[in-house]
Amino acid sequence: MSIIDNRKAFFDYHIEERYEAGLVLEGWEVKALRAGRGQIKEGYVVVKHAEIFLIGTHISPLPEASTHIKPDPVRTRKLLLHRDEIKKLIGKVEQRGYTLVPLNFHYKGGRVKCEIGLAKGKKLHDKRETEKKRDWEREKARIMRSAT
């Protein structure tokens, strides 16, 4: 079950591979995500010192958040992957012009996971082509409905 989706990622990038990563979250962040108070549209993934971090995601704290903790909604969050997956991703990101983008947050066994995609940026003409295909599919569906 998906908590938050990043639909903009599919419009801006060609997603070639997907990986599921664990997230290092604080308690108030998990509660806020359960309430649906997160946004990953502007988020991106970076590699630092052979570790992978999620930057730019916004998780708004609940008003009932603890009083002794100052919540930071846009803090950097560490992603948890196997070492060989990290090495593979580092190699592709550094050599072949790929980037890593967060695709969604979802639950797996009661824990919050982040699906990240190994992606290449689309050019403007690719985006237009995608839009034309989507419009044509809608038009075909409309024609088929009216014909029957």
UniProtKB/Swiss-Prot annotation:
InterPro entries: SmpB, SsrA-bd_prot, SsrA-bd_prot_CS. Its main location: cytoplasm. Gene3D superfamilies: 2.40.280.10. Residues 126-142 have a biased composition (Basic and acidic residues). It is found in: Cytoplasm. GO terms for cellular component: cytosol. The keyword Glycosyltransferase does not apply. One of its GO terms (biological process) is trans-translation. This is SsrA-binding protein. It comes from Burkholderia mallei (strain ATCC 23344). The gene is smpB.
